Amino acid sequence: MKKPLKEVIKDVSRDHLKKGNQLFGQCLSAVGWVGGTVPELSESDGLVELSMADVMAGGVITGAALVGTRPIYVVRYQGFQWFNASIIANYAAKSKDLWGIPCPIFIRSIAMEGGIGPVAGSSHHGIVYRMPGIRIASPMIGLIPFIYF
C-alpha cells in the first residue's frame, strides 16, 4: 500500500533536515503541523519558525541559501507569495546567472480554492512562472522536484 502524500512529504522533509539543511515557515508547529506534512522536530533539528511579518521571509530564505544550506520554505497559502516573490524572483533565482553564486531554494506553497479569503486562497504560482531560474512542480510529479534540488 502506498503512503499518503502528506507522509511522503514529511519523510522527505525529515531526511532533508538530517542532512543539515533547514525548513522555514510561519506557524510550522501550530495545530496540525501544516496538514501533517512537517516533521515534529525542533529548531535544533533545522526547523525555523519565521515571524508573522509577511514581507521578510523571502530575504531570510535567500540568505540561508546563499550561505550554503538548501532551505525548504513552507508557505501556508500561495496568496502570501505576493509578499515574498520579489526578492526570491529578482535575487535568488537570478543569483547564479548574474553573479555565479547558486541560491537553491525549495518552496512548498499550498494551493487551495475558495472559502479562505481573497489573499490566502487560490493558486498564485503564475506570478513567478516565467522568471529565469525558477521551476514549478506540483504534487502529481511525486519526488522528482526533490531529486533535482
Identify what each model region corresponds to:
Residues 1-149:
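Thiamine diphosphate
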